[in-house]
């Protein structure tokens, strides 16, 4: 009876994935997709999304059917800034806590990219060996994803001005994310400090839990929302720069902005202090300090977001499996001899023979690793958060002939501003690479909303990319000296990193410029494979 109850609980948790009929030819779906992937690599045509496109065409229910196998469902991560790093954190933390996690590689944050990623993980028969999926989705593609798969968890980070040629005004982006909140069946985790995101609580369906992550009052001024940015920039010169993850905070004048109206919402995880690769989080009324490997103060807030959604998953796992363990303990206490187990004499099930418990769990169709995850402590979650390293291009450090080269992705005014504030130019050489391909956004007018005056003292060694001359003009208006300008990105990157050997380098780059920068560096140094995880 206990086994059947647990089995029923697990099947109910899988109901967040829309059910579809399996076509008779589904046995060939994975093989066909892998053949297309192989052919596209050999011919160097089609890109990484082509296998997903083909699979969507021949077997539209593949995505829904495959993710429907996951006992803990899907975590969907979306928002303007921080998706990749936060997805990496959530996936790494859940994995370190014992779960088997499927996640989409960096850059595959659209539906076909997820399908393509699945092709590398499933068996030829379509079996996905994982407990949970953690998926980064672009705001626009997330809308299409939730029509096929209703996520059990949604983590919505922020809404900033980003690629307005794609989305229009930021209210349009918020509307896109509202569809995600409305489709979530278990828990929606929202950024309390972003008014547009916090407002999405109203879109969560009945029965869906809403949790928030937030900031302590004295940190809120350092993480302005898009609506706060004009106010923040207007006082920045007088108040001083933002803190970095490398530099302890110092007091500065009070800023009151649009996020003040949401400050009273209860936060499940609150970032209360940051310092030199350190952060303190408050959960359940208790503070937890940890060292962090991530760079940039903004990534410490991403860590708060990741902790909030991991806590939500753990709470559900506890609700699913711990009552079963208690029931098992009661049966053992009633008749330990008949079950072949022992109690500790105090009515506790701590001494239950693990082999017997595992046998019952396997009979119920529950993975023992999920039971172990249900026992994860808050301190264990904090410890795993501190071990996550930067995602590629997001504070990633590549060593070239002994010189550290740090890649910093920038794609909108707020992200660029926070990066400039977090990574001080003194003692480093700076390069900026700007492209305007589709993945970057065609409209580069947002560069004029970034304050580059912090670079006046050191100047910029090199500017490159398709829009190098636009960037150079923008720097000239802020009276920032520029040594060289070239649209030949690969040559410029190599020249830049080889100059002034031993001097640390910072390269600020848009998305496609970052990919090309990594490719250029891979020819002269060891560059890790792109992906999510450690």
What residue spans do the PLM features occupy?
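Structural beta-sheet core signal
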Residues: 135, 154-156, 190, 212, ...
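Buried hydrophobic packing segments
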Residues: 90, 94, 114-118, 303-313, ...
């Amino acid at each position: 009876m206990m086994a059947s109850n647990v089995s029923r609980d697990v099947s109910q948790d899988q109901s967040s994935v829309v059910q579809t009929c399996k076509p008779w030819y589904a046995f060939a779906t994975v093989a066909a997709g892998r053949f297309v992937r192989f052919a596209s690599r050999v011919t160097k045509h089609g890109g990484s999304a082509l296998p997903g496109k083909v699979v969507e065409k021949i077997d539209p229910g593949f995505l829904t059917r495959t993710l429907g196998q996951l006992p803990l469902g899907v975590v969907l991560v979306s928002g303007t800034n921080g998706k990749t790093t936060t997805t990496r954190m959530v996936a790494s933390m859940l994995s370190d806590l014992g779960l088997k996690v499927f996640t989409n590689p960096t850059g595959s944050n659209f539906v076909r990219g997820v399908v393509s990623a699945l092709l590398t993980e499933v068996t030829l028969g379509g079996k996905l060996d994982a407990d949970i999926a953690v998926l980064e989705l672009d705001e626009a593609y997330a809308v299409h994803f939730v029509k096929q798969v209703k996520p059990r968890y949604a983590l919505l980070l922020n809404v900033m001005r980003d690629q307005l040629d794609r989305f229009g005004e930021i209210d349009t982006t918020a509307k896109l994310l509202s569809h995600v909140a409305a489709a979530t069946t278990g828990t929606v985790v929202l950024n309390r400090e972003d008014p547009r995101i916090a407002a999405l609580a109203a879109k969560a369906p009945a029965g869906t839990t809403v949790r928030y992550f937030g900031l302590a009052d004295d940190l809120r001024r350092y993480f302005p929302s898009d609506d706060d940015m004009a106010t923040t920039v207007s006082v920045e010169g007088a108040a001083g720069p933002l803190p970095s993850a490398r530099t302890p905070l110092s007091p500065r004048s009070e800023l009151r902005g649009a996020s003040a109206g949401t400050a009273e919402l209860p936060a499940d995880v609150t970032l209360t202090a940051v310092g030199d690769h350190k952060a303190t989080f408050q959960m359940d009324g208790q503070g937890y300090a940890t060292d962090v490997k991530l760079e940039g103060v903004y990534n410490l807030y991403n860590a708060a977001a990741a902790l909030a959604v991991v806590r939500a998953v753990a709470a559900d796992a506890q609700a699913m499996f711990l009552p079963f363990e208690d029931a098992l303990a009661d049966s053992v206490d009633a008749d330990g001899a008949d079950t072949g187990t022992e109690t500790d004499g105090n009515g506790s099930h701590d001494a239950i023979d693990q082999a017997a418990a595992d046998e019952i769990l396997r009979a119920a169709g529950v993975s023992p690793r999920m039971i172990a995850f249900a026992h994860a402590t808050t301190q264990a979650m904090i410890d795993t958060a501190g071990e996550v390293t930067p995602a590629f291009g997001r504070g990633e450090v590549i060593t070239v002939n002994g010189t550290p080269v740090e890649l910093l992705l920038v794609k909108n005014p707020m992200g660029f501003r926070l990066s400039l504030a977090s990574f001080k130019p003194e003692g480093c050489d700076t390069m900026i690479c700007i492209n305007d391909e589709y993945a970057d956004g065609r409209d580069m007018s947002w560069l004029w909303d970034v304050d580059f005056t912090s670079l006046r003292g050191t100047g910029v060694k090199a500017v490159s990319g398709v829009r190098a001359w636009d960037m150079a003009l923008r720097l000239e208006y802020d009276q920032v000296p520029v040594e060289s300008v070239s649209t030949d990105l690969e040559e410029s990157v190599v020249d830049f990193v080889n100059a002034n050997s031993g001097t640390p380098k910072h390269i600020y780059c848009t998305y496609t410029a970052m990919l090309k920068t990594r490719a250029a560096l891979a020819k002269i140094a060891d560059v890790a494979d792109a992906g999510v995880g450690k």
